[in-house]
């Protein structure tokens, strides 16, 4: 076991799935297919074996948070207004964070009756391409300096204190922030914040994004598997973009396969792998829960912080 996992309890899949009594899975395979990332693979048994026990654990964390807030209100002799339970989800590009986040959104909404569950991605807090070009950071897109972290922290602070917010929306099709389009977040009971950067050091070193999380999850996998998934995703993005000249990836569809593969491999090595090794993976041990995925995309190990 690596030293960084000394403060975690490792739980194998067989043990984990026994931690929740068998119940009816609250979604169908077609629903599951509609929410998964297009290069990801997930079946209903993964929901039953992994995610239903995870939602049960989320229930435990949320109850503990509510009990703590109630006790603090007695100590302070004042009422503490209800706050959303905020879950951070991090991990590498192409590891399956989005699938995990969207699945949790549905399962939580169907487990906690009448709960409003919102999901935001930190892609919306990327600087627009025009700003990145001006600062000569376009080739560093996804690295910490390409995000408006102050805006992200301001958003989380407002949400935690009961304010409604509007945040920018990012499009992978145009590879940029969509002008004049926002996502409104209004009084959620649960907020899931998904992104590669949610556990990273802030630029001002005074406040962490993760300071606002009630529970943090890191989706993990061996690097060689993530690389394979990334290259598969790149190829599928080109297939989707083939007949859409407005799609950012359309420009690559006119190239030969060796040229495309070379671009994808260089992007992985010089941007995504570098970002993973320097900024993302070092934050892994800040998570409360680490979900480790095997080559077949199924979660084979769970690490729970002691």
UniProtKB/Swiss-Prot annotation:
InterPro entries: P-loop_NTPase, PanK, PRK/URK. Transmembrane segments: none annotated. Gene3D superfamilies: P-loop containing nucleotide triphosphate hydrolases. Pathway: Cofactor biosynthesis; coenzyme A biosynthesis; CoA from (R)-pantothenate: step 1/5. Its EC number is 2.7.1.33. It catalyses: (R)-pantothenate + ATP = (R)-4'-phosphopantothenate + ADP + H(+). Belongs to the prokaryotic pantothenate kinase family. This is Pantothenate kinase. The lineage of its organism: Bacteria, Bacillati, Bacillota, Bacilli, Lactobacillales.
């Amino acid at each position: 076991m690596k030293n960084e996992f000394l403060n975690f309890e490792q739980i194998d899949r067989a043990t984990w799935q026994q931690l929740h009594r068998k119940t009816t899975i609250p979604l169908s395979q077609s629903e599951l297919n509609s929410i998964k990332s297009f290069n990801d693979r997930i079946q209903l048994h993964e929901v039953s074996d992994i995610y239903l026990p995870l939602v049960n654990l989320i229930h435990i964390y949320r109850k503990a948070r509510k009990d703590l807030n109630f006790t603090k209100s007695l100590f302070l002799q004042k009422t503490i207004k209800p706050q959303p339970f905020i879950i951070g989800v991090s991990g590498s590009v192409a590891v399956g964070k989005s699938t995990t986040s969207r699945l949790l959104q549905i399962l939580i909404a169907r487990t906690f009756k009448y709960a409003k569950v919102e999901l935001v991605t930190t892609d919306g807090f990327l600087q627009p391409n025009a700003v990145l070009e001006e600062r000569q950071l376009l080739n560093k897109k996804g690295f910490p300096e390409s995000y408006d972290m102050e805006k992200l922290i301001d958003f989380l602070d407002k949400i935690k204190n009961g304010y409604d917010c509007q945040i920018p929306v990012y499009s992978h099709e145009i590879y940029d922030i969509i002008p004049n389009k926002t996502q409104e977040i209004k009084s959620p009971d649960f907020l899931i914040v998904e992104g590669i950067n949610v556990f990273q050091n802030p630029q001002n070193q005074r406040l962490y994004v993760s300071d606002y999380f009630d529970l943090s999850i890191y989706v993990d996998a061996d690097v060689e598997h993530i690389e394979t998934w990334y290259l598969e995703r790149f190829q599928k993005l080109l297939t989707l973009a083939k007949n859409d000249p407005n799609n950012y990836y359309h420009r690559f569809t006119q190239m030969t396969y060796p040229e495309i593969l070379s671009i994808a491999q260089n992007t992985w090595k010089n941007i995504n792998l570098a970002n993973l090794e320097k900024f993302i993976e070092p934050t892994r041990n800040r998570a409360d829960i680490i979900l480790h995925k095997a080559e077949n995309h199924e979660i084979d190990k769970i690490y729970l912080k002691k």
